[in-house]
Curated annotation (Swiss-Prot):
Species annotation: Arabidopsis thaliana
Transmembrane spans: none
Family: Belongs to the plant acyltransferase family.
UniProt EC number: 2.3.1.-
Domain of life of the organism encoding this protein: Eukaryota
UniProt KW keywords: Acyltransferase, Transferase
InterPro entries found in the cross-reference section: CAT-like_dom_sf
Official protein name in the record: BAHD acyltransferase At5g47980
GO terms, molecular function: acyltransferase activity
Tissues showing expression: Expressed primarily in the root epidermis.
Gene: BAHD1
Known role: Probably involved in the modification of desaturated thalian-diol.
Miscellaneous notes: Constitutes with three contiguous genes an operon-like gene cluster that is involved in the thalianol pathway.
Positions of the catalytic residues: 154, 377
């Protein structure tokens, strides 16, 4: 359902206590994706809340954000070249209102309307000069609900980092004791090598070389359908595939089929998946809550005439992940430095980047599952729904993002591909036998 908003106020929120005035060095990965952001929207049902006045709720959000920024102080800084100046410049907080009821909006989700729940650039503001963190609190009609939209610069945070920050902010809003709230490790160059402006003059843009602007759609895989898909995805080498392996393999197959439906001459295709280093490196080396773009990648490729069989892709998925995990294990147990490990991870990323070509369909896939986004409770309960505002964030990138469904067992998949491909993709009967296209969220 189309959403019309009225912006009530916009202000800069500074940390409640001064931050150390130092600089945070960006890694090669941070700098390379500096123009992208991580956009998320948390929807809350306030219908049964006693104190649901927008003024009261907004004050709590703003006050707790100021306190949270004292711990996550680089988010209140400014990107300058290949570093973050921790200068307490602050985050931008916008308050908006709509007459539409939350239940009405969630029953008929308009994918294109989601992006207006994410903070936009101010007049005269460029991608490079925007705040590292922007927040928008949108109040729905008759006190029915609230959407907290956040946009965090990708130069400082990946999805796991955003989860750590938002859960920390929410804990502050709930009034948790300071003993439970610690300052996280900002580990931008703990693994990956630092960016050098003389070498990395500008963020890389190879991912934007696709045929046309991408459009986004949402697909929901319920747990029972995932169970059936896993049976198809299983093989002798991988008898028990994960839901992420099975769903990503199906999506790649269907996206490739949609692309071929619009081409006279078939194209080669490639998919890449990022892997969270926090889950693979010992905690004495890297904190599970470390902030940064702490990812490695692997990729799979198919020629123009090759078929994409789900079980075969899953087997390759598993093999690549196991080899990646073994490489990390050997480096850590062998006493090698983080620099050595970072160089090996970067070598894999460089191999992937060298494969990016305009005549190859490349799908950038990430799993944001198990990131505890449904645990973000500001004091009025857990989210009724967590959505993404990923339209127009980085034009030209074909992406697939997996997030948990609210029950923790199903998966919501956000797919961004060229419009003509999407027209065929949403009609793929194999896909629709496992997934529902943008179903309502009932509260």
């Amino acid at each position: 359902m189309e959403l019309n908003l009225e912006v009530i106020q916009r202000e800069v929120i500074k940390p409640s206590s001064p931050a150390p005035h130092d600089r945070l060095q960006l890694s090669v990965i941070d700098f390379g994706i500096a123009e992208a952001c991580v956009p998320m929207i948390f929807f809350y049902n306030l219908a049964d809340l006693a104190e649901k006045s927008p003024d009261i709720v907004s004050t709590r959000l703003r006050s707790s954000l100021s306190q949270a920024l004292s711990r996550f102080y680089p988010l209140a800084g400014k990107k300058e070249g290949v570093s973050i100046s921790c200068n307490d410049e602050g985050a931008v907080f916008t308050e908006a209102r709509t007459n539409l009821l939350l239940s009405e909006f969630l029953r008929n989700i308009d994918i294109n309307s989601l992006k207006i729940l994410i903070p936009t650039l101010a007049p005269g503001e460029s991608l490079d000069s925007r705040p590292l963190l922007s927040v928008q609190a949108t109040f729905f009609g008759s006190g029915s609900g609230l959407a907290v939209g956040i946009c965090v610069s990708h130069c400082i945070c990946d999805a796991a980092s955003v989860s750590t920050f938002v859960r920390g902010w929410a804990a502050t809003a709930r009034g948790d004791s300071n003993d439970e709230l610690s300052t996280p490790q900002f580990a931008e160059v703990a693994i990956h090598p630092p960016a050098d402006i003389s070498i990395h003059g500008s963020p890389f843009n190879a991912l934007s070389e696709v045929r046309e602007k991408c459009v986004t759609n949402r697909f929901v895989f319920e747990s029972d359908k995932i169970t059936k898909l896993k049976i198809v995805a299983a093989s002798k080498s991988v008898p028990s595939p994960t839901r992420v392996e099975a769903v990503m393999s199906l999506i790649w197959r269907c996206a490739r089929n949609a692309s071929h439906a619009n081409l006279i001459v078939p194209r080669a295709t490639m998919m890449t998946q990022s892997m969270d280093l926090r889950l693979r490196i010992p905690t004495n080396v890297l904190s599970p809550d470390a902030i940064g773009n702490l990812q490695g990648v692997f990729f799979l490729k198919r020629g123009p005439g090759s078929e994409i069989e789900i079980s075969e892709v899953v087997a390759e998925f598993r093999k690549e992940k196991e080899e990646f995990n073994e490489m990390i294990k050997e480096n850590v147990n062998g006493g090698h430095t983080n620099t050595t490990l970072g160089q090996k991870i970067m070598s894999g990323i460089a191999n992937y980047m060298s494969e990016l070509k305009p005549n190859i369909d490349t799908y950038t896939m990430s799993s944001w599952c198990r990131k505890a986004f449904y645990e973000v409770d500001f004091g009025w309960g857990r989210p009724a729904w967590v959505g993404l505002g990923h339209q127009d964030i980085q034009d030209g990138v074909m992406y697939v993002l997996l997030v948990d469904a609210k029950d923790g067992e199903g998966v919501e998949v956000w797919v961004g591909i060229p419009e003509q491909d999407m027209a065929a993709f949403v009609c793929d009967q194999e896909l629709l036998s496992y997934a529902s296209l943008n179903p309502p969220v009932l509260i």
